[in-house]
Regions:
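Extended, hydrophobic/aromatic-rich amphipathic alpha-helical segments that build helical scaffolds
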Residues: 1-18, 30-55, 63-75, 103, ...
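Long, intrinsically disordered, low-complexity segments
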Residues: 2, 6-8, 91-144, 211, ...
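An aromatic- and glycine-enriched ligand-binding surface/loop that stacks and positions planar moieties
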Residues: 4, 8, 12-15, 33-186, ...
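Surface-exposed helix-capping loop/turn segments at secondary-structure junctions
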Residues: 16-26, 78-84, 233-239, 260-264
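Flexible glycine/proline-enriched surface loops and loop-helix/loop-strand junctions
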Residues: 22-29, 52-54, 205-211
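A glycine-rich, coil/turn loop motif that links secondary-structure elements
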Residues: 24-39, 87, 244, 267-270
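Intrinsically disordered or highly flexible coil/loop and linker segments, enriched in small
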Residues: 167-171, 261, 284-288
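Active-site beta-strand/loop architecture of penicillin-binding DD-peptidases
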Residues: 178-220, 360-361
Length: 361
């Protein structure tokens, strides 16, 4: 609590002296510098983590109220809006200039990410990050399931985030099946039957060393809506607004209803059911943005989820159709003591007994 209070006090002391917004014209080189919005986004994330079960074992509701208030403080600035293209939000110069981006780190033109993550059947591709079937199967169906295409009629964010078999990518049809160009049995191919799409520019000619600008999101509006939804639900339930502009349910449905995604609104009534909806929505909306591992830890769900086998699929082409077999790629282990890793003994010795080792180590 002492550390959290210090962080929050530093943010509160400086937030009003920070510029509200640099605007979206970055010709004068001001992009990436801290704004009031960025400071409040950090405050929102810190207080959400502090309210979560790992750090709040007694479930002190006042910590959830503080997290909700912090998210609302940022939302009340009315400076940001959800981007109308989830796919393009993460590409090139758009990331830094998007109306959704609160803080981004910009890079010069590069193709490192494409070179490391393009499918093995693309010249210069090396597979790299290979999404799991655990994640793919979590994307909801938006329409009626198609028995001939397990990826059809899903949450559109699946297609914006992950390359699946028989989809269009790199100017061709993906062949992630036995005997195909992106065959999972090929050297350096994906072990899961999937490739990463999010953040990657399509159709860069790696042979000619073609490059694009890239920016990395640190904070964006969708995260703040989801922070707000989670904290409001825990503090007041899914349908109360506590005098703020939004209920928890309204906040999460703004994210689900964003242009190009337009998933059905959540109508769940109970706090417990809504809690699971928030966890799901963070998994999907924020996929590969370095939230999932820390979310599982702060929720104390890691000992369940991260002990499940990591799975993939093996596809077989049968004429114009495909059959898919789920396979175990590797076993995973997460024990209770791994919620907090060991403090080096040298640091404990320096403290003259003040610092204690974390449990289990």
């Amino acid at each position: 609590d002492e550390v959290v209070n210090y962080i929050v006090s530093e943010i509160d002391a400086s937030k009003d002296s920070l510029i509200t917004n640099w605007g979206r014209d970055f010709d004068i080189g001001l992009d990436g510098r801290i704004t009031k919005g960025a400071a409040l986004a950090l405050k929102s994330r810190v207080l959400l983590y502090a309210a979560s079960p790992l750090y709040n074992p007694t479930n002190d509701v006042n910590k959830w109220k503080a997290a909700a208030e912090a998210a609302n403080e940022l939302l009340s600035l009315n400076l940001y809006s959800l981007d109308n293209s989830y796919r393009d939000l993460f590409l090139g110069d758009r990331t830094a200039k998007s109306s959704e981006t609160i803080l981004a780190i910009r890079q010069s033109a590069t193709n490192d990410l494409e070179r490391k993550n393009y499918p093995i059947g693309t010249a210069g591709g090396n597979s790299g990050i290979t999404p799991s079937h655990n994640l793919v199967s979590a994307y909801e169906y938006k329409g009626t399931p198609d028995p001939n295409d397990i990826y059809a009629n899903r949450d559109p964010r699946l297609g914006y985030t992950i390359v699946t078999n028989n989809s269009q990518w790199n100017g061709r049809t993906m062949e992630i099946y036995a005997g195909g160009a992106d065959n999972y049995n090929a050297k350096n191919a994906s072990r899961t039957g999937y490739y990463l799409k999010k953040f990657l520019n399509d159709n860069l000619d790696l042979v000619q060393d073609e490059k694009r600008l890239r920016s990395w999101v640190v904070f964006r509006l969708a995260e703040i809506y989801l922070n707000y939804a989670e904290a409001m639900n825990e503090a007041y339930g899914p349908d109360a607004n506590n005098g703020y502009a939004l209920t928890a349910k309204e906040a999460i449905n703004l994210v689900r209803g964003r242009t190009g995604v337009e998933m059905p609104a959540i109508t769940t009534a109970s706090k417990e059911e809504f809690r699971e909806k928030v966890k799901h929505e963070r998994r999907i909306e924020l996929a590969f943005e370095e939230h999932r591992y820390w979310d599982l830890r702060r929720w104390k769900d890691a000992t369940t989820v991260l002990n499940e086998p990591l799975t993939g699929v093996q596809a077989t082409k049968n004429g114009n159709h495909f059959s898919y077999q789920v396979k175990e790629v590797e076993k995973r282990t997460f024990t209770e003591k791994m919620y907090f890793y060991p403090i080096p003994h040298s640091e404990i010795n320096k403290s003259n007994g003040i610092v204690k080792q974390n449990p289990g180590w």
